A protein has these predicted regions:
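Alpha/beta enzyme core
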Residues: 3-31, 48-49, 67-91
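Alpha-helix-loop-beta-strand connector modules within alpha/beta enzyme cores
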Residues: 35-61
Length: 92
């Protein structure tokens, strides 16, 4: 069975995803820069909508080779969003 995921970066996009009955959303910000980790409140809104919610974890624009401190930040964000109740995370 085909699953449909919609990248969302606003409250309006979350509402549209719910209206379209997509299988899940990927919450992110700054899509014009390739996407970054979204705000906590936007992720909360996606979870509260009842949609299956995945969160993009990307601390900065640019390449995907991270320093030790960036990797520590990524791990903390994954743990935090997991405790919030997201269904998964997206890296890259």
């Amino acid at each position: 069975m085909l699953s449909i995921e919609l990248c969302v970066s606003s409250l309006e996009a979350i509402a549209l995803a719910k209206e379209l009955k997509v299988d899940r959303v990927e919450v992110c910000q700054n899509l014009e820069s390739g996407g970054l980790t979204p705000s906590v409140s936007l992720v909360e809104s996606a979870i509260d909508s009842g949609l299956k919610t995945h969160v993009l974890i990307r601390p900065r624009v640019g390449g995907f080779i991270y320093s030790e401190s960036e990797l520590e930040l990524i791990l903390r964000e994954i743990s935090f969003f997991n405790k919030m109740g997201v269904h998964g995370v997206v890296i890259g």
